Structures are given as structure tokens and as C-alpha cells.
Swiss-Prot record:
Gene3D superfamilies found in the cross-reference section: SH2 domain (3.30.505.10), SOCS box (1.10.750.20)
Keyword Ubl conjugation in record: yes
Protein known as: Cytokine-inducible SH2-containing protein
Keywords of this entry: Growth regulation, SH2 domain, Signal transduction inhibitor, Ubl conjugation, Ubl conjugation pathway
Gene: CISH
Pfam hit, one: SOCS_box
UniProt feature coiled coil, ranges: none
Induction (UniProt): By a subset of cytokines including EPO/erythropoietin.
GO CC term, one of those recorded: plasma membrane
Organism lineage string: Eukaryota, Metazoa, Chordata, Craniata, Vertebrata
Alphabetized GO MF terms: cytokine receptor binding
Function: SOCS family proteins form part of a classical negative feedback system that regulates cytokine signal transduction. CIS is involved in the negative regulation of cytokines that signal through the JAK-STAT5 pathway such as erythropoietin, prolactin and interleukin 3 (IL3) receptor. Inhibits STAT5 trans-activation by suppressing its tyrosine phosphorylation. May be a substrate-recognition component of a SCF-like ECS (Elongin BC-CUL2/5-SOCS-box protein) E3 ubiquitin-protein ligase complex which mediates the ubiquitination and subsequent proteasomal degradation of target proteins.
Species of provenance: Homo sapiens
Length: 258
């Protein structure tokens, strides 16, 4: 649709009086008087009157995507051998009490708002850190100030492997001041439920150091799985290996080094 506006012209006598005789013929305006507006002018007016949409629109949640992400994480954890299932914080403390610093395991969280908890032996004893899940990603629980700096991962095994590699690189670094490991708050699950257990120090943060997983005896890893771990540590892309399809599929089922 083309919009037209009437240009300036002198008023006729009948128009000055505001009356028009019935016998008066219809007036034909000269061509220059009727000037079409450019097509973009109307669009610009509409654009100016329409409020701009905010850039940070809420993300639409996809339950199917969440289900697939959580199912994949459970599959990886069962293959790992260091997923301990539904043990409590006290049981995890007993298992890790005599282990060297940096020994860790993953278990189900006792908090209804979390799926998993990372239990690790630190300089202050066994410590539990909850693992958050949001927007199809997992991250370590932390306070509000440091949360934007905490990395997110598509599954729990990728999360743990990242921090193990980070701690290993810091240990091997020749620099006098290696990059610090993430400082995380003491969650409520660390409060000892047994009065006989010693209470943790009143510090508010603990430096996380992950070195080696604590494999469950009932989930002893097979020789095939151990060979798969070695291949994953030595080869960046298993698709480049001249392997039978069945063996290549087995390697892809657990593409991790832990």
C-alpha cells in the first residue's frame, strides 16, 4: 500500500468559506501535489513506536534434552568405576579418611535439589562438594560471587576430568606460583551427622585438589576398560585409528581418561 500526502496549494474561493456547491465538479489535483511516501518511512515509524526486545530472553527449557543429558551422565558414571551411588556423607568420609590427599569419588547427593556430590580427601579431611545441574550442564557448587567463573560441562565425568588435569598441570608446573585450584564453600553436607566424628575447622573455603579416583571394589574395572583408558590418554581422536567398527564403538562409549 502506498501512502500519499497532500502538498501545499492555494485555497479556492469556495474552500475559504468552508462551503462547496453541489453542482461543483470534482477537483483534480495536479500530479506534483500527490507525492507518495518512501516505503521505508512507514516501517521506520513502526520501528520507533515498537519497544525493542530485550537481549537476555529466558531460555526455553527442554525436558527431553535434560533427560538425555542426565541419562548420558549416569551411563558414563557407571562405566567409570568410581561412582558410589547412594552412600551417605558419613560413609564417604569413612572410605576416604585413610586415603591420600586428592582421592575422590562421586555419589548421589542427599540434598533434594542436587543430583550428585563430589567427595574428596583434602588437607582438612574428607570434604563434600555438591554438583549443580542447570541448562543441560553441570558445575561445582559455589557462592554467588565466584559462580560466574565456575566452568560448566555437559556431564559429570568431563567436569571431574577437567579439574584432575588442571591439578596435574599445576603440580608439574615449574613456576613458583602455580594457578590456584578453585576455592569452594563448605556445603551443609559436610556437617558431621555423628557426634563422635571431629567437626571441621571453622574456615569458610577449601582448596579443591583432585588427583586419583577411588574405585569401588564391587565395580572393579575390566581389562578392556583399562586398555580403553590408556588409548584415550595417548590418542586424541580414536576415529583416526584403523580399528574394527565394534572396537571403535566401544572406545566412543567412554571417551575419558579416568
Amino acid at each position: 500500500m502506498v501512502l500519499c500526502v497532500q502538498g501545499p496549494r492555494p485555497l479556492l474561493a469556495v474552500e475559504r468559506t468552508g462551503q462547496r456547491p453541489l453542482w461543483a465538479p470534482s477537483l483534480e489535483l495536479p500530479k506534483p501535489v500527490m507525492q507518495p511516501l518512501p516505503a521505508g518511512a512507514f516501517l521506520e515509524e513502526v520501528a520507533e513506536g515498537t519497544p525493542a526486545q530485550t537481549e537476555s530472553e529466558p531460555k526455553v527449557l527442554d525436558p527431553e534434552e535434560d533427560l538425555l543429558c542426565i541419562a548420558k551422565t549416569f551411563s558414563y558414571l557407571r562405566e567409570s568405576g568410581w561412582y558410589w551411588g547412594s552412600i551417605t556423607a558419613s560413609e564417604a568420609r569413612q572410605h576416604l579418611q585413610k586415603m591420600p590427599e586428592g582421592t575422590f569419588l562421586v555419589r548421589d547427593s542427599t540434598h533434594p535439589s542436587y543430583l550428585f556430590t563430589l567427595s574428596v580427601k583434602t588437607t582438612r579431611g574428607p570434604t563434600n562438594v555438591r554438583i549443580e545441574y542447570a541448562d543441560s550442564s553441570f558445575r561445582l557448587d559455589s557462592n554467588c560471587l565466584s559462580r560466574p567463573r565456575i566452568l560448566a560441562f555437559p556431564d559429570v565425568v568431563s567436569l571431574v576430568q577437567h579439574y584432575v588435569a588442571s591439578c596435574t598441570a599445576d603440580t608439574r608446573s615449574d613456576s613458583p606460583d602455580p594457578a590456584p585450584t578453585p576455592a569452594l564453600p563448605m556445603p551443609k553436607e559436610d556437617a558431621p551427622s555423628d557426634p563422635a566424628l571431629p567437626a571441621p575447622p571453622p574456615a569458610t573455603a577449601v582448596h579443591l585438589k583432585l588427583v586419583q579416583p577411588f574405585v569401588r571394589r564391587s565395580s572393579a574395572r575390566s581389562l578392556q576398560h583399562l586398555c580403553r583408558l590408556v588409548i584415550n590418554r595417548l590418542v586424541a581422536d580414536v576415529d583416526c585409528l584403523p580399528l574394527p567398527r565394534r572396537m571403535a564403538d566401544y572406545l566412543r562409549q567412554y571417551p575419558f581418561q579416568l
